[in-house]
Structures are given as C-alpha cells and as structure tokens.
Amino acid sequence: MAGDHEDEFFDFNVSMVSDPLSTFYGRVDTDQMIEEGIHPGDIAVINKAEEPKHGDLIVTFVNNEFVIRFLDLSHLEDHYILLHPSNRRYSAIRINDIENFEVWGVVIWTIKKWR
C-alpha cells in the first residue's frame, strides 16, 4: 500500500511494459467488455508488437471504429474469424475477409477507473 514503503518507487512503464516503443494506451469507450470487468473510462494498455493468439483480448478497426474484443481463431478452416464481446447484450462480430483483417494490438493490461 502507499506509504508502507516510502523508499520504493513504482514505475509503471518499467515494471509492467516490456516493449515501450510498441505500447500504446487507449481509453475504453464501450460497455462491450463489462462482464470481464472492463468499463468505459478504463485504460487499455495495448502492445502493437505482440503476435495475436486465439483467446487474446485485442483492439482492431471494424466498421470505421476501434473495437476491443476477444479473438476467436477456431474457425480459420472455415475461412472466418469471430470477435467476441464480454457483454450478453452484444453479438460476436464475424470477419469473413480474413486476408485483410488486421489486429491493431493486443491488450496486455487494463487500468481501472474508480471515479
């Protein structure tokens, strides 16, 4: 807790970001991930150099807007990708044009906004 170790200093960029040149921060502006505990106003720490894998939380650009979703690669043999929200009010986004689909970055941390 703050004040317990006054001589220690926590530097977020050193302690939690392994690749500062490829890391960006974005404010979440959607409720599509609330069941995962990610709410509007939270900050997503995004690494553009990470290779996206099945199940990763990613940021991508779909229908002229940035979206934050879970990447589902289990349908690659059927030539499509799904992007899953974490809010039952929203449906998965199906990506049929996988040749031109681009992940903007992989979310490696989120920072919670309390107020």
Roles of regions detected by a PLM:
Residues G55-I58, R69:
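Short beta-alpha junctions and helix-cap segments that line functional grooves
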Residues M1-H39, E51-H54, E65-F66, H75-Y80, ...:
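Short, positionally conserved secondary-structure boundary motifs
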Residues K48-A49, S86:
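Fold-independent oxyanion-binding glycine-rich loops
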Residues I43, I68-F70, A92-R94:
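Well-ordered beta-strand positions in beta-sheet-rich domains
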Residues V45-I46, V59:
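Hydrophobic beta-strand signal
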Residues F70-L71, P85:
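Residue-level recognition of conserved beta-strand positions in structured domain cores
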